[in-house]
Amino acid sequence: PRYIEFEKDKPVTPDQTIRIRMDVVDEIQKLAELANRYNLHVSLNLHRAPGYCVNAGFNEPFNLWKDVAAQEAFYFHWKMWAERFKNVSPVKVSFDLLNEPSFREDMNDQFSAHGPVPGPVYRKIAMETAQVIRAVTPGRMIIADGNNMGGDVIPELTDLGIHQSCRAYFPHFISHFQAPWVWKDPSKAPMPVWPGIIEGQQFGRAQLEEFYKPWIDLVGQGLGVHCGEGGCWKKTPHPVFLAWFGDILDILTPHSIGYALWNFRGDFGILDSGRSDVDYADWYGHKLDRKLLEILK
């Protein structure tokens, strides 16, 4: 909850979810303006919303998928952002409603069992959010992240004029090897290979093509699709990462599905990724992963 007022050492209360720190909102808007100045499009996304975040860590007071109060707070946030950007061209700023939605049994337990949000529930919330946004800024491009943490196409939204966002994290054995927010005991994560067999399952180019086929079919229906996040955490062996990611890009780019790394600089990034098996090049004092750069070109 980057821009709400709350006490970090206490659970978030329902009323705090709509107490907005306008000074922080100003900072976010200025950042978007700076990006636009350099001809970068900004896709504004709520990584944490009232009643849901893919990463637990703050005590949520309610469940976005079950509680009307949470949904009303969610609409409140998007109305605020719509008003903030109503005079900014949709070419410069789009809205991505919520990062990696899933239905988690316990919103406050990172390792709680989870699965897809029921389609009618996702449709209701996405449709009502879009109505709130379009009442203020009618031409705004709206994007919904794939169901089940970004992995699944959402057929329930295809008639709503809402585009969809997939992920480049399949299989998670590759992308999140030993990541502590995924593995309770990172030492038990199986060693990734590409292509090859992991935990008794075959993974390779054919499995990737099968995974992305529904997304490619969605493009064929005339809807926009982008891969809003992707990459590997720093513990994945670099040759495995490059071979796997090269296959993903070979599958997505012929179908005009753009993509983004989770971060530009950091553990998933092209700069300062902190890997132990990369011969970095110096780039203005930063450590550049040149082999990854070549793939991205």
Regions found by a protein language model. Name each.
Residues R2-V25, P50-A69, E105-H114, I270-D279:
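Surface-exposed, active-site-proximal loop segments in enzymatic domains
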Residues K8, P14-Q16, Q221-T236, V240-F241:
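An exposure/low-complexity boundary signal
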Residues P1-C53, Y122-T137, F241-H255:
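Aromatic-lined substrate-binding rim segments of carbohydrate-active enzymes
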Residues P237-K297:
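Aromatic-rich peripheral "rim/lid" segments of glycoside hydrolase catalytic domains that contact
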Residues V42, H226, A260:
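Conserved Rossmann-like nucleotide-binding pocket used by diverse enzymes
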Residues A56, F62-F203, E209-C232, P254-I257:
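Active-site region of glycoside hydrolase catalytic domains
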Residues I20-R21, G119, R205, P237-H238:
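A generic secondary-structure micro-motif detector
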Residues P1-R2, L46-Y52, L98, G146-N148, ...:
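Short, solvent-exposed turn/loop segments enriched in Gly/Ser/Thr/Pro and often Arg
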